[in-house]
Curated annotation (Swiss-Prot):
Cleaved by avrPphB in infected plant cells. Its cleavage serves as a signal that triggers the RPS5-mediated defense system. Autophosphorylates. Autophosphorylation may be required to trigger the RPS5-mediated plant defense system. Induction: Induced by flagellin (flg22). It is found in: Cell membrane. In infected plant cells, it interacts with the P.syringae virulence protein avrPphB. In uninfected plants, autophosphorylated form interacts with RPS5. Interacts with FLS2. Changing G241A: Abolishes cleavage by avrPphB and RPS5-mediated plant resistance to P.syringae. Keywords: ATP-binding, Cell membrane, Kinase, Lipoprotein, Membrane, Myristate, Nucleotide-binding, Palmitate, Phosphoprotein, Plant defense, Serine/threonine-protein kinase, Transferase. PROSITE patterns: PROTEIN_KINASE_ATP (PS00107), PROTEIN_KINASE_DOM (PS50011), PROTEIN_KINASE_ST (PS00108). The modification Phosphotyrosine is found at Y160, Y261. Disruption phenotype: Reduction in H(2)O(2) accumulation and callose deposits. The gene is PBS1. Gene3D superfamilies: Phosphorylase Kinase, domain 1, Transferase(Phosphotransferase) domain 1. This is Serine/threonine-protein kinase PBS1. It comes from Arabidopsis thaliana.
């Protein structure tokens, strides 16, 4: 699915004031980036940006080198040679605003991915500039590494580290019949890693960066299925000061866009959280965000899944059949709770991505062992039966009571249970650290006493 511009929203890129702000102050040491880029920076300590009205504003970059564009500048002939003149055999696929090729740099022998932007694209140049700047300033293990770029004449190319396992979309929706589907543990690991990349953009960059095109095809996989976010051409700087959103022309991918952004053009970090929820649902269900080949009523993933969230007896139906039942039922419920909270229609009710990272890190650490499947499945089924009895007025309502008093509260109740488990895990970890610290202090004290006695 490609990018689209929907509705006839204003092209204004200014920040609109509103009454409240959900974003705290960022530390001065955080990476600083500039918006509305008109050209690549020359390496100075300031980046200038121009608003539609023509007025300039300057964003100071840290003096620790973040302001320097570290990416290497390539000549077009170097990249043509690396890709055998963009031979069809080196073609990897379509990326945002261009085609991606596999290449090998003659100078270093490094295998790379080369994205050649569409020279006829109306926005290709802006997206090129944004991506070069973003990936040059922002570095994180879950963001793809930009090696360099080419801006010879009208040529616009980006050179990335090569991600050998392709995209998450490949493994979820384009998997050959002879290939094994991602297992439950790997899906949770990928979700947690992708969320960490998004958290870095939202909470560590200053001002925050809104990704704006979070989707399964933009999550690339390295060796070991380590996920990295790619394609930053649509990224926008988030609101600053007392602003709570950015007003911009609606861009993104159908099926992933948050409803408030699609309708009003008002963009916040919670817009990314919605998109993350859609991708997380793809991981859980194995379904596409939009699939025209599915029966009527099941073509839109979110619209299909939402009613199922209100009936715990149907939770199992949300699991990807290719998992073949090899997943912990309780973890499935918890994962669905996270997804449900992320795709809430009201942006204010969605969690912050930092909270999502906490929840998914917990789930990713609860490794599922297929060899223990039978006993665990029996325990989960007993818990499910307790829930059923509770519906009829009996039973104890155990920790598998995911819904509480009303069905519509089930995602919230599950989130509460998940938070309780996370808090318990934190408490145990803190207790261990405290115990280790206390033992170390005692050891040092005893050692000091022993040395004192020996000298006496």
């Amino acid at each position: 699915m490609g990018c689209f511009s929907c509705f006839d929203s204003s092209d204004d890129e200014k920040l609109n004031p509103v009454d409240e702000s959900n974003h705290g102050q960022k530390k001065q040491s955080q990476p600083t980036v500039s918006n509305n880029i008109s050209g690549l920076p020359s390496g100075g300590e300031k980046l200038s940006s121009k608003t539609n009205g023509g007025s300039k504003r300057e964003l100071l970059l840290p003096r620790d080198g973040l302001g320097q564009i570290a990416a290497h500048t390539f000549a077009f002939r170097e990249l043509a040679a690396a890709t055998m003149n963009f031979h069809p055999d080196t073609f990897l696929g379509e990326g945002g605003f261009g085609r991606v090729y596999k290449g090998r740099l003659d100078s270093t022998g490094q295998v790379v991915a080369v994205k050649q932007l569409d020279r006829n694209g109306l926005q290709g140049n802006r997206e090129f500039l944004v991506e070069v700047l973003m990936l040059s300033l922002l570095h994180h293990p879950n963001l793809v590494n930009l090696i360099g770029y080419c801006a010879d004449g009208d040529q616009r190319l980006l050179v990335y580290e090569f991600m050998p396992l392709g995209s998450l979309e490949d493994h979820l929706h384009d998997l050959p019949p002879d290939k094994e589907a991602l297992d439950w543990n790997m899906r949770m690991k990928i979700a947690a890693g992708a969320a960490k990349g998004l958290e870095f953009l939202h909470d560590k960059a200053n001002p925050p960066v809104i990704y704006r095109d979070f989707k399964s095809s933009n999550i690339l996989l390295d060796e070991g299925f380590h996920p990295k976010l790619s394609d930053f051409g649509l990224a926008k700087l988030g609101p600053t000061g007392d602003k709570s959103h950015v007003s911009t022309r609606v861009m993104g991918t159908y099926g992933y866009c948050a409803p408030e952004y699609a309708m009003t053009g008002q963009l916040t970090v919670k817009s990314d959280v919605y998109s993350f929820g859609v991708v997380f649902l793809e991981l859980i269900t194995g379904r596409k965000a939009i699939d025209s080949e599915m029966p009527h009523g099941e073509q839109n993933l979110v619209a299909w899944a939402r009613p199922l969230f209100n009936d715990r007896r149907k939770f199992i139906k949300l699991a990807d059949p290719r998992l073949k039942g090899r997943f912990p039922t309780r973890a499935l419920y918890q994962a669905l709770a996270v997804a449900s909270m992320c795709i809430q229609e009201q942006a204010a009710t969605r969690p912050l991505i930092a909270d999502v990272v906490t929840a998914l890190s917990y789930l990713a650490n609860q490794a599922y062992d297929p060899s223990k499947d039978d006993s665990r499945r029996n325990r989960d089924e007993r818990g499910a039966r307790l829930i059923t009895r509770n519906d009829d007025g009996g039973g104890s309502g155990s920790k598998f009571d995911l819904e509480g008093s009303e069905k519509e509260d089930s995602p919230r109740e599950t989130a509460r249970i998940l938070n309780r488990d996370i808090n318990r895990e934190r408490a145990v970890a803190e207790a261990k650290m405290w115990g280790e610290s206390l033992r170390e202090k005692r050891r040092q004290s005893e050692q000091g006493t022993s040395e004192s006695n020996s000298t006496g």
